[in-house]
Curated annotation (Swiss-Prot):
GO terms for biological process: coenzyme A biosynthetic process. Pathway: Cofactor biosynthesis; coenzyme A biosynthesis. The lineage of its organism: Archaea, Thermoproteota, Thermoprotei, Sulfolobales, Sulfolobaceae. HAMAP family: Dephospho_CoA_kinase_GTP_dep. GTP binds at D55, V57, D74, K76, E128. Its EC number is 2.7.1.237. PANTHER family: GTP-DEPENDENT DEPHOSPHO-COA KINASE, UPF0218 PROTEIN TK1697. This is GTP-dependent dephospho-CoA kinase. Catalyzes the GTP-dependent phosphorylation of the 3'-hydroxyl group of dephosphocoenzyme A to form coenzyme A (CoA). It comes from Saccharolobus islandicus (strain M.14.25 / Kamchatka #1) (Sulfolobus islandicus). Keywords: Coenzyme A biosynthesis, GTP-binding, Kinase, Nucleotide-binding, Transferase. GO terms for molecular function: GTP binding; kinase activity. Signal peptide: none annotated. Belongs to the GTP-dependent DPCK family.
Length: 179
């Protein structure tokens, strides 16, 4: 997807009609931190990038010496509890994103970060949950995308063409509207 002159674009994908579909885990649900951390460590040893969406999963990894290539965070867990500030990285980006939506401009920002060899942190003013979608679409096959499943554990998605197809299918069902 290419968006030209994205500074002038004030459009979002809205997902109100897809809440039920988006509420289920789309990868491997880990409820045991040791098993989760072992899995992530092995993925890194194989040369794949680890990308996190959410403050809690980012913090758990950092506390265990695993620094994600890209972190997408909003400073909260469950929309209200203040969380950690990510380990400072060379590249930090600030974006605004409303709950239940994805701003068009965020697709390009995430794609550019994932192409960069240094990674970075995206700080979201608003809600970061749905940003798993542009992350998956921009990640390389084999990369690991991790997000938190409230009151359940961490969901790990191993990016491949099938998951990208599923995410594109969800994106096609979203409604485009002004942000």
């Amino acid at each position: 997807m290419e968006i030209r002159d994205n500074n002038k674009v004030n459009l979002c994908f809205a997902f109100d009609n897809l809440r039920k579909e988006l509420s289920r885990p789309y990868g491997i649900l880990f409820t045991n931190n040791k098993v989760f951390l072992d899995f992530v460590s092995k993925s890194i040893q194989q040369g794949f990038k680890v990308i996190t969406v959410g403050d809690y999963v980012s913090r758990v990894l950092e506390e265990n010496g695993i620094i994600p290539f890209l972190e997408v965070i909003d400073g909260k867990t469950k929309r209200s509890i203040p969380q950690h500030r990510a380990i400072v990285k060379n590249k930090e980006y600030r974006v605004t994103n409303e709950a239940g939506k994805i701003r068009f401009e965020i697709f390009e920002i995430i794609e550019n970060i994932l192409k960069d060899r240094d990674g970075g942190v995206v700080f979201v003013n608003g809600e970061e949950d749905l940003l798993v979608i542009p992350v998956i679409l921009s990640a390389n096959n084999g990369d690991i995308v991790i997000y938190g499943q409230p009151n359940a554990g961490a969901v790990v998605i191993i990016v491949n063409e099938m998951i990208k197809w599923r995410v594109r299918d969800i994106l096609e069902k979203a409604v485009v509207e002004e942000c």
